[in-house]
């Protein structure tokens, strides 16, 4: 840092005032954020999208809803047969699924989801054969969500090397050597 006499600042802040305004990490150690340790004053100036995206596409939501409906169906079938249900092992649920026998069960299987039934009570499924829960609203409706083009998964791939014919390569080398 270049030291200047106080008189040369003429209207500008003194060096002591400038040093007080500079950021010192020792002063902000108690106010660090949980994520990567940035001070809060830096995060307040710029609030970008989070590093992870909490957006779930409708196709993925439908797949998970169908999976949960199948799991609930398996639990109901296991209770009906008198077998104990092991909720801790998800792989056992995936391996032992049965086809629905009634059309109403098929309809319910596609419409029920984890958000609709927070507990594993199977008695709520068969309260009414026409029971169709409303689809859950996406969390992104509340805040400005990503557009369909903004958050696409892009897999990195090494670009293909361009192969020039040997004659063109030699001609380009000769042009560069003549200059």
Swiss-Prot record:
Segments forming a coiled coil: none
Q: Where is the composition biased (Low complexity)?
A: 1-15
Q: Where is this region: Disordered?
A: 1-20
Cross-referenced InterPro entries: CDRT4
Q: Which Pfam families match?
A: CDRT4
Record-given protein name: CMT1A duplicated region transcript 4 protein homolog
Q: Which gene encodes it?
A: Cdrt4
């Amino acid at each position: 840092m270049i030291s200047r006499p106080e008189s040369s600042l003429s209207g500008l802040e003194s060096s002591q005032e400038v040093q007080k305004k500079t950021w010192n990490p020792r002063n902000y150690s108690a106010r660090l954020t949980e994520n990567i340790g940035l001070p809060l004053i830096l995060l307040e100036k710029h609030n970008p999208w989070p590093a992870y995206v909490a957006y779930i596409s409708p196709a993925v939501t439908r797949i998970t809803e169908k999976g949960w409906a199948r799991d609930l169906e398996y639990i109901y079938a296991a209770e009906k047969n008198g077998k104990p249900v092991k909720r801790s092992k998800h792989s056992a649920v995936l391996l032992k699924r049965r086809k629905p026998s009634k059309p109403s069960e098929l309809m319910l299987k596609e419409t029920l989801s984890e958000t609709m039934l927070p507990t594993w009570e199977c008695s709520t499924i068969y309260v009414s054969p026409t029971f169709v829960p409303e689809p859950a609203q996406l969390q992104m409706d509340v805040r400005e969500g990503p557009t369909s083009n903004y958050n696409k998964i892009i897999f990195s791939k090494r670009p293909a090397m361009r192969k020039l014919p040997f004659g063109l390569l030699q001609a380009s080398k000769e042009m560069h050597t003549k200059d």
